């Protein structure tokens, strides 16, 4: 399900969903369905599957397709499903894009090819080839801290002319570059870093793709709702209130995949272990995450009292 709103083609509130595994490390499709249903019921317009948080480097092609199929069965047309298909290999990325389309995805998340560090003209050609290969809309994924390659703003502007390149997941930490693209294209920008959700929304972003939303899907939806209602003070308060949990999950030295799964597991929700080379969080880390979560829950309860 994509929306009729060109400014937010996949909705506003998206979760970068973890990929649940069983205790032995096998794909847990039942857990994925239960988690997806919970996220959508609590305010997510869309789910990004097999992204960074979804451990895409360590899931097989068959697992990626099976995950899309299972989650589609769980959420029906209540949410947009954006499938992560980006790899370091253009041919492989095209294969994954076609498989995701067949499995029922609504869109594709395509990260810049990593490790080989292609120049901008090669990067542009890569994205065009992937976008040409299927009928699904594409969300570019700019996360140079992980890929080693920036999708430069001028490259994004050129790619915006492609009819199926409709959005960007922005993890570049370049506010000027983001504004440059927003001012020159109709691309929908999605904040890919939880601490930047309100700042980017305030300058015209479509919404967000959040890792923290795995645990608190209502939180950042409330930020956007307050801003849309004209209550910018409350929007800012809610964004600041999230800082301890965002810091614990995203800025404490561990990948968000690890912390999200640890906290979900501690709360009795589907998650399971991470796959190697990642390692699951230890008890001390999990206790700290629970403390930050409890603080946020207490603050929310007081504000509603």
Curated annotation (Swiss-Prot):
Annotated GO MF terms: 4-hydroxy-tetrahydrodipicolinate synthase activity
Alphabetized InterPro entries for the sequence: Aldolase_TIM, DapA, DapA-like, Schiff_base-form_aldolases_AS, Schiff_base-form_aldolases_CS
Keywords: Amino-acid biosynthesis, Cytoplasm, Diaminopimelate biosynthesis, Lyase, Lysine biosynthesis, Schiff base
Active site positions: 141, 169
Domain of life of the native organism: Bacteria
Catalytic activity: L-aspartate 4-semialdehyde + pyruvate = (2S,4S)-4-hydroxy-2,3,4,5-tetrahydrodipicolinate + H2O + H(+)
Binding site for pyruvate: 53, 209
Subcellular location: Cytoplasm
Protein task: Catalyzes the condensation of (S)-aspartate-beta-semialdehyde [(S)-ASA] and pyruvate to 4-hydroxy-tetrahydrodipicolinate (HTPA).
Protein family per UniProt: Belongs to the DapA family.
Protein name: 4-hydroxy-tetrahydrodipicolinate synthase 1
Organism, scientific name: Streptomyces coelicolor (strain ATCC BAA-471 / A3(2) / M145)
Highest classification ranks of the organism: Bacteria, Bacillati, Actinomycetota, Actinomycetes, Kitasatosporales
């Amino acid at each position: 399900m994509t929306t009729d709103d060109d400014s937010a083609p996949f909705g506003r509130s998206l979760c970068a969903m973890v990929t649940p595994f069983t205790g032995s490390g096998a794909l847990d499709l039942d857990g994925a369905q239960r988690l997806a249903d919970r996220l959508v019921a609590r305010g997510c317009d869309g789910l990004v599957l097999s992204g960074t948080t979804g451990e895409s480097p360590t899931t097989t092609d068959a697992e990626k397709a099976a995950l899309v199929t299972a989650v589609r069965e769980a959420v029906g047309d209540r949410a947009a499903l954006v499938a992560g298909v980006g790899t370091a290999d253009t041919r492989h990325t095209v294969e994954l894009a076609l498989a995701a389309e067949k499995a029922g995805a609504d869109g594709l998340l395509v990260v810049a090819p990593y490790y080989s560090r292609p120049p901008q003209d090669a990067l542009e050609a890569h994205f065009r080839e992937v976008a040409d290969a299927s009928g699904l809309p594409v969300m570019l994924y700019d996360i140079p801290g992980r890929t080693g390659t920036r999708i430069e703003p001028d490259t994004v502007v050129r790619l915006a002319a492609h009819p199926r390149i409709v959005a960007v997941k922005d993890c570049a930490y370049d506010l000027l570059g983001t504004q440059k693209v927003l001012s020159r294209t109709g691309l929908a920008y999605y904040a890919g870093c939880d601490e930047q959700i309100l700042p980017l929304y305030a300058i015209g972003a479509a919404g967000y793709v959040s890792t923290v939303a795995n645990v608190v899907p209502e939180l950042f939806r409330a930020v956007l709702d307050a801003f849309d209602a004209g209550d910018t003070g409350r929007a800012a308060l809610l964004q600041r209130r999230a800082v301890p949990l965002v810091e614990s999950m995203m800025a404490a030295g561990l990948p968000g995949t690890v912390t999200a799964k640890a906290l979900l597991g501690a709360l009795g929700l589907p998650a399971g272990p991470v796959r190697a080379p990642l390692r699951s969080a230890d008890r001390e880390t999990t206790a700290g995450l629970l403390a930050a979560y409890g603080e946020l829950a207490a603050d929310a309860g007081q504000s509603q009292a």
